[in-house]
Design a protein with these regions (language model features):
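N-terminal post-signal-peptidase region of extra-cytosolic proteins
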Residues: 66, 119-123, 138-139
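Stable alpha-helical elements in mature extracytoplasmic
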Residues: 122-125, 130
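Active-site loop-helix segments enriched in His/Asp/Glu that coordinate
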Residues: 130-166
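Histidine-rich, glycine-flanked metal-binding segment
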Residues: 35-79
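Short, solvent-exposed loop/turn and secondary-structure capping segments
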Residues: 37, 56-57, 82, 92-97, ...
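Bacterial Sec-dependent N-terminal signal peptides
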Residues: 1-23
Length: 166
């Protein structure tokens, strides 16, 4: 049951923060940073879909008028999104079905292969992985001496242009 509430809060956290015109502030949560540190009673600000501030709320002064919305999330834990490196996520669906495998070309030297344009934003697997906290993937081709060019993609996007991380 706690897992369900965590995913609901996390989805709300991302959805609301992306739509705001001014920064959105989340107060009081325990922030787990990517380097392993933990900040109790954190103040987390998001603007245009990106985290622009993570600080200890007891050590900074916050102007409430600078934020569009302030959420009090005391007792909750917030984690950064995960990044999966060196994967075929989005360029393969079912390994047993050759037609759904876009990760390998014939021949051993294929520097022209670009996973950027082969990425499938409608992948069912990517949606499942995204619901577990993975939001960015390095999609990499396989096979051969020179396999091609990898791409770093957002798992949320309408097409490959939207999904490309630039």
């Amino acid at each position: 049951m706690n897992k369900k509430y965590f995913y609901l809060l996390f989805t709300l956290f991302i959805t609301i923060a992306v739509q705001a015109q001014k920064p959105t502030l989340f107060m009081g949560a325990t922030a787990h940073l990517g380097n392993g540190t933990k900040i109790e009673n954190a103040a987390i600000s998001m603007f245009n879909g990106k985290i622009d501030m993570v600080a200890d709320a007891t050590r900074i002064r916050i102007d409430p008028s600078a934020f569009d919305t302030i959420y009090r999330v005391h007792g909750k834990h917030l984690y950064p999104a995960f990044i999966v490196p060196n994967t075929t996520l989005g360029i393969t669906e079912i390994d047993a079905v050759r037609a759904s495998n876009d990760y390998q070309e014939t021949g051993s030297i294929n520097p022209n292969v670009r996973t950027l344009i082969a990425y499938n934003t409608d992948s069912k697997i990517a949606k499942t992985v995204r619901s577990n906290g993975v939001f960015i993937a390095q999609v990499t081709p396989r096979g051969g001496t020179i396999s091609g060019q990898s791409s770093v993609m957002h798992l949320a996007g309408w097409n490959w242009e939207d999904a490309a991380l630039r």
